[in-house]
């Protein structure tokens, strides 16, 4: 009994830290980056100032393809605003902009060899699925039936 109490006391005593954790000042942590430190408000061209009209046939097609229900007014407004935003970003001029591979472009990226370390576990993984077809998972359909 005494041995057990000594172990408990030692564990409690040994896990207490006497060092205070330092607060990090994130403004001092700087890396060479092309990401601006302050938000940039870009003026998108207002190409779709007019209201977007969606006919019922297009809405039914989107519902069937995306497996979502667009019956509510809020869902239609979200869809229209998404279409307007997509229309705005398609008009951004990116002709002379080089592709950005990483945010920290001046740091060397350490890549590892792409080797398979574990494998041959297809049967084990597929055993967790309720329905499979030709070694593929079969996901349940959404809230809209596919047959129309």
UniProtKB/Swiss-Prot annotation:
Origin: domain of life: Eukaryota
Record has Lipid biosynthesis as a keyword: no
One Pfam family hit: GatC
Residues passing through the membrane, by range: none
GO BP term, pick one: regulation of translational fidelity
Catalytic activity: L-glutamyl-tRNA(Gln) + L-glutamine + ATP + H2O = L-glutaminyl-tRNA(Gln) + L-glutamate + ADP + phosphate + H(+)
Keywords: ATP-binding, Ligase, Mitochondrion, Nucleotide-binding, Protein biosynthesis, Transit peptide
Transit peptide: 1-10
Principal subcellular localisation of the protein: mitochondrion
GO molecular function: ATP binding; glutaminyl-tRNA synthase (glutamine-hydrolyzing) activity
Family (UniProt): Belongs to the GatC family.
PANTHER family: GLUTAMYL-TRNA(GLN) AMIDOTRANSFERASE SUBUNIT C, MITOCHONDRIAL (PTHR15004:SF0)
Protein function: Allows the formation of correctly charged Gln-tRNA(Gln) through the transamidation of misacylated Glu-tRNA(Gln) in the mitochondria. The reaction takes place in the presence of glutamine and ATP through an activated gamma-phospho-Glu-tRNA(Gln).
Protein name: Glutamyl-tRNA(Gln) amidotransferase subunit C, mitochondrial
Organism: Drosophila ananassae
